[in-house]
Amino acid sequence: MVKDLLQNHMHPLGLCNNNDEEDLYEYGWVGVVKLEQPEMDLKPCLTVLGKAKRAVQRGATAVIFDISDNPDAVEQLNQGLDDPLKRPVVYMKGMDAIKLMNIVNKQKGARARIQHRPPRQPTEYFDMGIFLAFFVVVSLVCLILLIKIKLKQRRSQNSMNRMAVQALEKMETRKFKAKGKVSREGSCGGLDTLSSSSISDCAICLEKYIDGEELRVIPCTHRFHKRCVDPWLLQNHTCPHCRHNIIEQKKGGHGPGCVENSLSHGRQQQQQRVILPVHYPGRVQRTGPIAAYPTRTSMGPHGNPITVLTVERPVEPDLYPARTPTFLAGYRPVSLDHASSGHHCDLEHPPYPAPPAGHAFRRAKYNGRGFNNGTCYSQYETMYQHYYFQGLSFPHQQEVGGSQASRVVENGHNHSFHSGNMLYQPAPTMMHMAPPSSVESCYLHSQHQHRSVCSGYLADVPCSDSSSSSSASSAQGHASSSDSMLDCTEASNQGVYGSCSTFRSSLSSDFDPYVYRSCSPAKTGGGDAPASGGEGGTGRGRVECRSHQTFPNSPSRDRLSSCSMEMNYSSNSSLERRGAVLSSGTVPDASVSIAQSGGKDRRGPEKGCACCFQRQAGDPSSDCTTLYLGPEPHQTLGPSSSGGLYSVTSNILHRTDPGTVLGHPSRSCCLYEENHGSCYNEDYAVSIQYALAEAAAAAAAAAVAGCEAGQPIPIIPEDPGYEGGLEYVGHVSWEMEGDEEEVLYCQEGPCCMLEEETRALCRSTAKDRAGSTTGQDCHQTDTD
């Protein structure tokens, strides 16, 4: 409210006049009151509020107080807010009060304009500039971030589009061919054309493929029309059917084609890589690991898991050489085909025996007890049984034409190990003799019913096929035996390089993995003696394996057998240089076959078959590695420390003096001969000399002298921790039919009968020894 008022100056004491009769001033004047200091007016007549009321009563339109000297007057004025005045009351101080007082003091009259405004509250103060500045800064930051994100997405999208274009360019395209038209092979074994035998309509446009129409084949093997799937792939980068990402496929960098599939399969196998330590027979210092991968696992006939290990091979066999140890280069390939092997054997080789139903497999400790006779397998089953892993390649990759290529099939499972089309035999290989006509005589009936093939070195890791039974004939070779490696639960890298995978996995000093012994696990069965050689219609040259003789008070239950050559784990073995000389005793009346280090070959009139010991009329090739029956002729090299035992070397097998311990002159042995000496001078020859316990030695000598049947020959010390060993009484004999010349061993009492031709061989051998030993004669007895 603004008003023009006539100023009327009044003295403050004039307001203290209480005389009501005094004339009132004309209405419209403004009273100006200068308040003095409180110290000067100790007893004011009226308060500041009372003075304002007095002025209003006298007709003042407004009252102005100068509170420069008395600032407390504001509080006194605020006390009358409950009863406000009808006229405005204004207080002034500072420069405004000085100016006003100057005007009042110098002029008689003046005009004043009073403008009323409400007081400002402190909360109402707000600076819009600060807010605007802050808002602008935040907006700029957000805008910059959005721009950067957008640019990054655009660059990523451009990169993905470029990668999609590149992946699309590298994808193969094929032309659709109608049914009946010939399709040609692609570079990787795939087809450049697609026939209508597969899905013949596009999953995008739902139209059928037309002959000659170009189709896009995605790496996931789904195919569509090129015009339909290309825009989708460029935009979404995935297969419309299975959502396979083509960009991720490109990032893998494997490339299209068959090599990509094989490499992806190799990466899956790499996750379960197994390193198998492999020792080769006769090569003491040359051993090396072989990398293999588990390909499949199945259950054996006894409920044990069998895992097939495949040896690592390069993707392109033509581009990469076979990973073969150099020291195997000297071994010649051996074909599995009878027609190409040059060996014609009329003996029958029955399949592996099936274990009785309901008999649980039990892994026993190796102490020679509870094992069965070595089954008389054919050489084609034996020599490839433990030396090859699936996919392992060996040198001499020669092609074999016709039906000779890869005919190693057992029960529908392919066991051949392709190195060219031949299988290669590490030497020396232990041959097994042929089976008899009676299936029972050579079948395995041990307590755990486990078919143990005693031949060569074998790592105690799963590396065989899962075939439950072996039924291949002699014309079919076996590259691996599932039953000789049934217990695959201990798939460790500790190798037991023995001849039977059921042996305990131990590399202690008791075991010498480079020593052979001529002892096959004995046959059990509660004295179930097989038929004699004449029973059952045995064929020509058939050899029958029976239970072995036993000796009283022997600490072990090992049975001595001539069926196979095994490793000795508890014998006194020695490693000798190839030039070392081993002594042997006089062995009369036996066929002789010795390969001297100097190259001289002394043999009898006829030789036995390398696999089944069938006599052959002709001279076999000098390049083959063979086994011979009968004792070794005497050599004038001095007496031996242990008798009746075998010594095995890479060049020659010796037989020690038979008169000291076992003491029987006509005891047979399996002689192994490798006509070709080793190519390496640093190779060691392995010799074996079995030592009997002192208590059992005398008993063994006495028993042999009497030729008592049913006594075990102690070879391996007693294993007290073994459980479940079966003791029985049996006898052993080797019988030949007709006019065949062969050794007949002791059956009942002192028999030791020899055929006429065998005695002739023994006499010819005695002439060659020329005074080396005396007192040993060939004993002739009547045949039963």
From Swiss-Prot:
It catalyses: S-ubiquitinyl-[E2 ubiquitin-conjugating enzyme]-L-cysteine + [acceptor protein]-L-lysine = [E2 ubiquitin-conjugating enzyme]-L-cysteine + N(6)-ubiquitinyl-[acceptor protein]-L-lysine. Pathway: Protein modification; protein ubiquitination. Residues 150-784 are cytoplasmic. A zinc finger (RING-type) spans 202-243. Its EC number is 2.3.2.27. Residues 765-784 are annotated as: Disordered. It is a single-pass type I membrane protein. Its main location: membrane. InterPro entries: Znf_RING (IPR001841), Znf_RING/FYVE/PHD (IPR013083), ZNRF-3_ecto (IPR040700), ZNRF3_Arkadia_E3_ligases (IPR051073), ZNRF3_Znf_RING (IPR045903). The keyword Transmembrane applies. One of its GO terms (molecular function) is ubiquitin-protein transferase activity. E3 ubiquitin-protein ligase that acts as a negative regulator of the Wnt signaling pathway by mediating the ubiquitination and subsequent degradation of Wnt receptor complex components. Along with RSPO2 and RNF43, constitutes a master switch that governs limb specification. Belongs to the ZNRF3 family. This is E3 ubiquitin-protein ligase ZNRF3. It comes from Xenopus laevis. The gene is znrf3.
